[in-house]
Amino acid sequence: MVAPASEPSADLRPMGLEELCEHFDLSRPLAQPLTLRYELARELNHACIMAATPQSLARYMAEQLHQRGLIPVNAQVVKAVELVRAEVYELREFWSKSDYLWVPPTEYDLKARRQCDDPQTPLLLRSLAEGIHKLTEVSEESVHGAIVQVLDDYVWPRAKAMDSLRLALVGALRGVAVEAIIAFIGIEDAYKRIRRRIVGLG
């Protein structure tokens, strides 16, 4: 005997994209446990984040910024979301993936310092700081041009030079493209961060 078909559960109704993001956000308690494996849930969550508009995700980042006393304009928040969301798998990660865009580093990763620092590092960073500071307008393209010019003039090893610059800006070897970081924080802030790192090198 075949059992009669049951009525569809209310939980199976189609959900909008933003609601899906919230439903599968692993940082929020759920009324019913997910049956998906943790890794699969993270991937689904990430897919929702990548499919959502930056504007719809901006409020999650804004909440995390406000909790830390930071109140940027909405356009900045939307831009930050655009930059970092490829690295975000849970909504609560917006701060940890974008902190360096909002506040300068107060310390520098020891392993990265050992990898980047040598007697030429202060001169390298000073040259990069001066090249960036000469820019009259800031964009990823103009910053890239300034960096390439310095590296070509001094024949610095490019990979190590970019890591040294990233360490000065972020405090670790992580984050989005160096050019994108500088274009976001601005020339003056980037210059100050690099100079602070030079002073720390002695």
Each model region followed by its residue ranges:
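Non-catalytic, well-ordered alpha-helical scaffold segments
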Residues: 18, 38-42, 78, 82, ...
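Small-residue-rich helix-loop
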Residues: 54-154
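Alpha-helical recognition segments enriched in aromatics with Gly/Pro capping
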Residues: 1-51, 163, 167-173, 196-200
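Charged substrate- and nucleic-acid-binding regions of tRNA-handling and nucleotidyl-transfer enzymes
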Residues: 140-201
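Generic structural signal for hydrophobic core residues of well-folded globular domains
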Residues: 2, 24, 45-48, 65, ...
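Structural motif
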Residues: 11, 31-37, 71-80, 153-160, ...
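Short alpha-helical linear motifs
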Residues: 44-45, 64, 102-105, 185-191
